[in-house]
């Protein structure tokens, strides 16, 4: 009998061609960046397990950077949506929390809040995530602290139905883009950090410099979203640089 988890965390490793891979072996508090993300996710109290899903080109690097107790799923597949569907066959679960591997400040408390909100929804939902004040999914923003929740059966349905290339690359895009087919729940992103002048993802050296400045100021163990918001609120010069980067890379 196959054991089925209630909720599985899946960290999607950035592709080998991404800017993040250039920085992936850099270290924070002695840990490679990808290990750092993995350990923040495993701090969640409501995930039954965590795996990393990587494309074939990135798998060798991922296996050297991901802690040995966290499986890396890198089976060959035509696209990432197909790879996720295959991963869910190997790791059966009722629901998934999807985390981007470049979300350095992914917040385990926000992951747990998301799971609770999805499970306690008045009507059963297929997808839940944080929504930004601009009406877009907050996971698409450069704030970089959010995750998204979905039922495994919704992912399998998307895998069968999605034809557009972008829907095959961005594994949840088909689901949240079709509210007529799936029950969607949006949770308001925290106003304190849902801002145009906040950027906590990493795509270049400027982002890396900001990350180091933040960790130097707050320490590696005090990086919850509230602490980040309070710190950035008193850093107008840093926020101006972040806003400029967000505008330039939009």
Q: Language model features by range: what are they?
A:
Residues 23-28, 144:
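Short glycine-enriched, charge-decorated loop/helix-capping segments at active-site entrances
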Residues 204:
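Short, conserved phosphate/pyrophosphate- and ester-handling motifs at nucleotide-, phospho-/glycolipid
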